[in-house]
């Protein structure tokens, strides 16, 4: 899918930039939430705290700014948003989707980019964008050394900006 009507998110990392086309027509609440968090600087300084080869890279947890790695992956913005599952889109390589807890309506700020087709996630996680440039950056991130919790041993911080 290439929806050129939505905003573009740029995730800047030490490995380069990941440029993402957001899909407000597919998941308006998720796009609005992501854009607001990015514009408020919420994501700046957070890390990709969970990377799993042949699956995905996950970031957007405010706790990932902390040195205590045991808190990484459990942070949120203090609220959650309702799921918006797509009937038509699939979790193919390059898709941006929202992470959540066991409740489908528990997404907040954490997101992931799939680095390999992961159709088993379809209709369970809210797709709200797709990488249009910089997938090689995601591939570099997913290949870093990590601990037993899939948390990279080196900090991979991000700065997220939005272009209309």
Show where each model-derived region lies.
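Cyclophilin-like peptidyl-prolyl cis-trans isomerases
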Residues: 1-164
């Amino acid at each position: 899918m290439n929806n050129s009507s939505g905003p573009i998110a740029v995730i800047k990392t030490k490995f380069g930039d990941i440029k993402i086309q957001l899909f407000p027509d597919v998941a308006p609440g998720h796009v609005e939430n992501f854009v607001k968090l990015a514009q408020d600087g919420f994501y700046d300084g957070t890390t990709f705290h969970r990377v799993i080869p042949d699956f995905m890279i996950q970031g957007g947890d405010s706790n990932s700014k902390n040195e205590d790695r045991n808190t990484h992956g459990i942070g949120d913005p203090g609220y959650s948003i309702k799921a918006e599952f797509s009937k038509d889109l699939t979790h193919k390589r390059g898709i941006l989707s929202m992470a959540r807890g066991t409740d489908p309506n528990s997404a907040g700020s954490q997101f992931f980019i799939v680095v390999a087709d992961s159709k088993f996630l379809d209709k369970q996680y809210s797709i709200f964008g797709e990488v249009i440039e910089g997938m090689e950056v995601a591939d570099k991130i997913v290949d870093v050394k990590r601990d037993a919790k899939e948390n990279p041993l080196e900090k991979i911080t991000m700065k997220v900006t939005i272009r209309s």
